[in-house]
Each structure stands twice: as structure tokens, then as C-alpha cells.
Amino acid sequence: MLIYGKDIREQIKERVRQSAEEVKMGLAIIRVGDDPSSMAYVRGIRKFAEETGVKVEIVNLPDAVGERELLKTIGDLNNSSEITGIMLQTPLPASLNASHLVNAIDFDKDVEGIHNYNLGKLISKEEGVRPCTPKAVISMLKAHDILIEGQKVTIIGRSMTVGSPLALMMTAENATVTVCHTRTRNLKEEALRADILVAAVGKREFVTADMVHKDMVVIDVGINFDENGKMLGDVHEEARNHCRLASAVPGGIGVITVAELFDNLRILSQKA
């Protein structure tokens, strides 16, 4: 059975809409190039902003942009009183140092929760802004009354935006967590041990039916596109049909992630 994120999105949207009436909220998005998955994400952000009355400024830069120009753009947004949250859209061209650029964002405007300061708060279990997609995964599981505590959770993917912070957040929920990746030996066997499997590898239909079992909950974080522009997740359709519950793509984690981005903006704006 497929599970969706629309109801969770609507709950967060109402919270954000109310805050937008009370405090100044301004989101800046810096985009480099025209990656299809990032364009889809930005479309979702625009729509959410329109529905909640939040100001969004999008800075579009070419693939060939230099790091110095990007740093200047970030600096200007850091100093803007109209902007309370900044997002650097990834992936970035290989010529740019993503970590250096993300950490140039004022941590008080780090709407994605991936600045080293905010990741440090996650590691030390201090209150702070959490990365959006991991927040979305936890929100989806809890909204559908899926037990996390005591469960075996396998995460395929170890990025600093999804896999690694999600492992910490799942551990904080008292799950037993295994982090895998494309070079994990016996990946199929590791996946099959899971009660909850999270696919965050960024490869189209990477998780196949022989990697899941009928009692498993599968959360698909992936946003990929086929040759015809159809959105596909990291989980193959046959795998979704073979497990107990699976998040939909589209309409699953992606729509909650956008909402969680604005929820983070709400938190930062109230502190500004």
C-alpha cells in the first residue's frame, strides 16, 4: 500500500501561514544551472510560498559561475534584513566546493539545517534546525503510526543532507540503524534485515523487489526522471508492491520536504 504526504503538508502549511501573518518571513534560493530534480523542487517551493504568503527570492546563476561570485551572493543575502532563510540548491557543479559554500551561509539563516553549526547541534542532541528531508521521513512515519523505537532501520545513502543526519535522528528515536551505500557488500542481505528501509541513494529504481519483504516499510526519498520526464523514485514499482507500506513518488516525501523547509524558515524567522 502506498502512503502519501499531502495531509502532513497541509498541517505544516497552516502552521507556516499563521506565522507568516505574525512575523517577517523571507526565503532566498540560490540555483546554479538547471538540474531537473532541483527545478522540480523549486516549483514545489514556489507553490507552497504562494499558498502561505511567504516571500521567496530566487537567484539563478549559470553553471560556469565562480565560487567568488557565489560567496558574494551569499554574503549579500546574509546581510539582508528581508531574508530570514537561505537555501543553496544542490547538486552544484563539480568545480564548486559545496561544503565551503553551505558554511558561508549564516547559520541563523540556514533553512536546510546543514551548516556545520546546526549539524553539530544534531550530533550533540541540542535543540536546533534539522535537515528537511530527514525531518520529512520522521514526520511521515509518525503520521502513519509506524513504530520507530526498537525497529531495525536500514538507510541506503550517506549524504550529509539525508542519509547521515537521518541516521542520527533515527537513533535519537531509539531505532537500531544501519547505513549502507552503493559500495556496501551484500547490500541485498543488509536491506532484507530491515523493518524500515529508507532509499536515499539518488539512483532511479535502485531498490528492487528482491531487496524488500512483505512486512517491511519502505520510504523512498529519491527524485529522478526518466527519458520522458516522468518522475521516479529510488524504489522500483515491483518493490513497492512487495512490501507492507511504501511512500509514493511523486506525492510522498518530496511534498513533506518542501513543507519542512518552510517550517524551518518559520522557526528561524521567529528568532530573527
From Swiss-Prot:
Sorted UniProt keywords: Amino-acid biosynthesis, Histidine biosynthesis, Hydrolase, Methionine biosynthesis, Multifunctional enzyme, NADP, One-carbon metabolism, Oxidoreductase, Purine biosynthesis
Enzyme nomenclature, EC number: 1.5.1.5, 3.5.4.9
InterPro entries (alphabetical): Aminoacid_DH-like_N_sf, NAD(P)-bd_dom_sf, THF_DH/CycHdrlase, THF_DH/CycHdrlase_cat_dom, THF_DH/CycHdrlase_NAD-bd_dom
Pfam families hit by this protein: THF_DHG_CYH (PF00763), THF_DHG_CYH_C (PF02882)
MF-aspect GO terms: methenyltetrahydrofolate cyclohydrolase activity; methylenetetrahydrofolate dehydrogenase (NADP+) activity
Record carries keyword Oxidoreductase: yes
Family label: Belongs to the tetrahydrofolate dehydrogenase/cyclohydrolase family.
Name of the protein in question: Bifunctional protein FolD 2
Organism: Syntrophomonas wolfei subsp. wolfei (strain DSM 2245B / Goettingen)
